[in-house]
Amino acid sequence: MKKSINLRSLAAQAIEQVVEKGQSLSTVLPPLQHKVSDKDKALLQELCFGVLRTLSQLEWLINKLMSRPMTGKQRTIHYLIMVGLYQLLYTRIPPHAALAETVEGAVAIKRMQFKGLINGVLRQFQRQQDELLAEFSGQDARWLHPMWLLNRFQTAWPREWQAVVEANNERPPMWLRVNRQHHSRDEWLKLLEENGMTGHIHPRYPDAVRLDAPAPVSALPGFEQGWVTVQDASAQGCVELLAPQNGETILDLCAAPGGKTTHILEAAPQASVMAVDVDAQRISRVYENLKRLKMKADVKVGDGRFPSTWCGETQFDRILLDAPCSATGVIRRHPDIKWLRRDSDINELAQLQSEILDAIWPHLKPGGTLLYATCSVLPEENSEQIRAFLSRTPDAQLDGTGSTQTPGIQNLPGATEGDGFFYAKLIKK
């Protein structure tokens, strides 16, 4: 039964939901993957991620190949053609198979009358591919980012913006975090090799291992037993800087899906940890991660702007605030971000971050540490945010992360093999 489902039509429908309806791929894709065989799940993911990674190129090509855009209920055909173009450009699928399966996608979504159109457009691309790609190489769309975001990168990083964009357009590496409560990193690497896989360590983060070739978690030694967790190297930097200690009371704010909560408990198993997130659906992932790693934390649904509603007057020794942000540092992992975000979102997010910082600061004990982190590369959410906070908060000071003028540490995507991340470590006087 599962074999008869046309993957190209599923991919086209998923991409349409993202681009036209503003749904995130992480919401749209899993239900569709349940419809297909395990063997086909990876290809469905590749088609969806790949089209969203290269969307501006595929859009440009369709505009060149078609005299009129598909509108209304026929938009799914537009995205089906994109799926076909992506296969011809970026996969090893034989062209005849890519064409045949994409054309059959029209049958799967009951648009048989468009089979000839899809076939004609894709064959026209094959004939004109070299000249079309030569012309495309001079277009702004070649950067595969919306112009508003490209402009922000160029303003924020006049020397590095091109490297940032190129890193965003790459496939992400698969980083793991070894649970030091079970094995040292070197011990687990030996187990990995015994299972026919290889990886290498990160020079800065002591628990991080990068797989030389991505693998399903079911193949990782001890994954179900909690020996290892999938987490990018840059995200692991949060707990390294937070430096949690046994016996402390620690708050992980904006905690879902729980990767940093469990990392805190791996580093300080005798700490008392509260994990809070505003999203009741995503908080279930925190419970899942705690259960797999056999850990306990006080998990709550709560808004970071109103901490008294979920922690009363409690003060914490350490607070990790992984603030809601534009996620512009993790585009290589979530290419839909490029098309879901809007320029106006940035100021709105900066305002939200500011409100959370001001609200949570009174809940940090004197002498305590707050680590502010984002997976953004935009100064408005990062260094400018912290500079403004320091200027209005007399009892806050930086602790070894940057200077007063440019507070914090900014990792750009790919620069340390990890995602784009920002950290600022603050001490309450």
UniProtKB/Swiss-Prot annotation:
Keywords, sorted A to Z: Cytoplasm, Methyltransferase, RNA-binding, rRNA processing, S-adenosyl-L-methionine, Transferase
Catalyzed reaction equations: cytidine(967) in 16S rRNA + S-adenosyl-L-methionine = 5-methylcytidine(967) in 16S rRNA + S-adenosyl-L-homocysteine + H(+)
InterPro entries: MeTrfase_RsmB-F_NOP2_cat, MeTrfase_RsmB-F_NOP2_dom, NusB-like_sf, NusB_RsmB_TIM44, RCMT, rRNA_ssu_MeTfrase_B, rRNA_ssu_MeTfrase_B_ent, RsmB-like_ferredoxin
Active site: C375
One Pfam family recorded for the sequence: Methyltr_RsmB-F
GO biological process entries: regulation of DNA-templated transcription; rRNA base methylation
Main location: cytoplasm
Record's keyword annotation contains Transferase: yes
EC number: 2.1.1.176
GO molecular function, one term: RNA binding
CDD domains reported for this sequence: AdoMet_MTases, Methyltransferase_Sun
Origin: domain of life: Bacteria
GO cellular component: cytosol
UniProt-annotated location(s): Cytoplasm
Residues reported in the UniProt entry to bind S-adenosyl-L-methionine: C254, A255, A256, P257, G258, G259, K260, D277, D303, D322
NCBIfam families: PRK10901.1 (NF008149), PRK14902.1 (NF011494), rsmB (TIGR00563)
Free-text function comment from the UniProt entry: Specifically methylates the cytosine at position 967 (m5C967) of 16S rRNA.
Family named by the database record: Belongs to the class I-like SAM-binding methyltransferase superfamily. RsmB/NOP family.
Protein name (Swiss-Prot/TrEMBL): Ribosomal RNA small subunit methyltransferase B
